[in-house]
């Protein structure tokens, strides 16, 4: 076990490179199961969830090699098992993404019900119902989804709720199905579009990515290719807030400004000066931020994965802001920890009301999920004295070398044994 120690009060300044998006890399790594030969995936972030996915693929028999630039070559021709065991799946919800590819390519799958962050029910029933509509036989027994099929058949699937992983799983399954599949109320997130772009480059026939209706014409085979995943928009937003909250000035390289419109608008509302180019964003903040109010929504709305970070900003901003969470349940656990640091926060249903205070005070705090842990680090950067963030294994699931990147910008932060 490790923790982060942060001494706040330093203005962040400098340049950093943004990593590839974990939420794009994970489904694309699962999509390698669909290929009929070796496939190389580049711009992969070095994260615990990526390592877990590689271990899962390797356990199934996929041949894996990784070079010094974190390019992963996966060769599914040596696959000998369609079993995703509990000891791997329990730590990461995205492991459910192997279900669709295994069924479509090999006709069977046995996948443990997934784990991951404890931020609401996040049911997998939409995956199961969609695959049943395509002709698969699925049962849930002893904590496992057990599935079989001949060749999947195209179907019209109307998702009851917008689900990113559900859309991705069904899209991958439909790519090799017989006939045409239409997915309505599909997720529109950039990571879904990136997966569709990857599948199309492999030979799939997918139309409508980025809209709420996907049309997938099944093909007989998909080729192994090289594909680079898109930059991480959530990591980008987190470091922009780190600069804004400390009155700093930074430039992000290898990022994608067009994916961050909802976040950049709110940062400008808070008083930041922002400039963008094709693959870079610069931000400068002078003085205390102004409070902002946000309401989370599926893309292209304000991302739920950024609300905890804006909570940290509102804690020390001038004025009162509100954060309304409409996507997941139980996603304000970080607020209790911020109150230990002197934050003035009141929770009413699915809304947090934050009245900015002149300063936070360093304190021992505990991370409860991935984005909550990032928000506590942000609060520590601006707090007086030392903040100790425990249970940082959460943050290692989604941020590559966070203490190194922040130290590169001038933060006083270090990782120590707990």
From Swiss-Prot:
Binding site for phosphoenolpyruvate: 22-23
GO CC list: cytoplasm
Biological process (GO), any one: cell wall organization
InterPro entries tied to this protein: Enolpyruvate_Tfrase_dom, Enolpyruvate_Tfrase_sf, MurA_subfamily, RNA3'P_cycl/enolpyr_Trfase_a/b, UDP_GlcNAc_COvinyl_MurA
Modified positions (2-(S-cysteinyl)pyruvic acid O-phosphothioketal) in chain numbering: 117
Class of this enzyme: transferase
Protein's cellular compartments: Cytoplasm
Catalytic machinery residues: 117 (proton donor)
Transferase recorded as keyword: yes
GO molecular function: UDP-N-acetylglucosamine 1-carboxyvinyltransferase activity
UniProt keyword annotation of Glycoprotein present: no
Protein origin, superkingdom: Bacteria
Pathway: Cell wall biogenesis; peptidoglycan biosynthesis
EC number: 2.5.1.7
UniProt family annotation: Belongs to the EPSP synthase family. MurA subfamily.
Protein name as it appears in the record: UDP-N-acetylglucosamine 1-carboxyvinyltransferase
Lineage of the species this protein comes from: Bacteria, Pseudomonadati, Pseudomonadota, Gammaproteobacteria, Chromatiales
């Amino acid at each position: 076990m490790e923790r982060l120690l942060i001494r706040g009060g330093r203005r962040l300044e400098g340049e950093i490179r943004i990593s590839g998006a974990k939420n794009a890399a994970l489904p694309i790594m699962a999509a390698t199961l669909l290929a009929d030969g070796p496939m190389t995936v580049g711009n992969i972030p070095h994260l615990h969830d990526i390592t877990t996915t590689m271990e899962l693929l390797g356990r199934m028999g996929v041949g894996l090699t990784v070079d010094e630039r974190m390019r992963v070559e996966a060769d599914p021709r040596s696959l000998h098992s369609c079993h995703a065991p509990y000891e791997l799946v329990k730590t990461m919800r995205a492991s459910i993404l192997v279900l669709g590819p295994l069924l479509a390519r090999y006709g069977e799958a046995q996948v443990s019900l997934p784990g991951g962050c404890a931020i609401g029910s996040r049911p997998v029933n939409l995956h199961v119902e969609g695959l049943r509509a395509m002709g698969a036989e699925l049962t849930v027994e002893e904590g496992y989804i057990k599935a079989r099929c001949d060749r999947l058949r195209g179907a019209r699937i109307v998702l009851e709720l917008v689900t990113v992983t559900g859309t991705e799983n069904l899209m991958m399954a439909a790519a090799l199905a017989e006939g045409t599949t239409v997915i309505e109320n599909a997720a529109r997130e950039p990571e879904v579009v990136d997966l569709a772009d990857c599948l199309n480059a492999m030979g799939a026939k997918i139309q409508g990515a980025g809209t709420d209706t996907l049309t997938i014409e099944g093909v007989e085979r998909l080729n192994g290719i090289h594909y680079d995943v898109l930059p991480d928009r959530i990591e980008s937003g987190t470091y922009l807030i780190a600069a804004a909250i400390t009155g700093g000035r930074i430039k992000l390289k290898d990022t994608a400004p067009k994916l961050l419109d909802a976040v950049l608008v709110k940062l400008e509302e808070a008083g930041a000066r922002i400039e963008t180019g094709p693959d870079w964003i610069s931000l400068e903040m002078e003085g205390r931020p102004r409070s902002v109010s946000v309401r989370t929504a599926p893309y292209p709305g304000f991302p739920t994965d950024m609300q905890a970070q804006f909570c940290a900003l509102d804690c020390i901003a001038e004025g009162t802001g509100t954060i309304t969470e409409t996507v997941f349940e139980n996603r304000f656990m970080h607020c209790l920890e911020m109150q230990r640091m002197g934050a003035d926060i009141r929770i009413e249903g699915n809304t947090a009301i934050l009245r900015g205070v002149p300063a936070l005070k360093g304190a021992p705090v505990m991370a409860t999920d991935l984005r909550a842990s990032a928000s506590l680090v942000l609060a520590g950067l601006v707090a007086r004295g030392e903040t100790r963030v425990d249970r940082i294994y959460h943050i290692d699931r989604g941020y590559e070398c966070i203490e190194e990147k922040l130290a590169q910008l001038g933060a006083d932060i270090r990782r120590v044994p707990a």
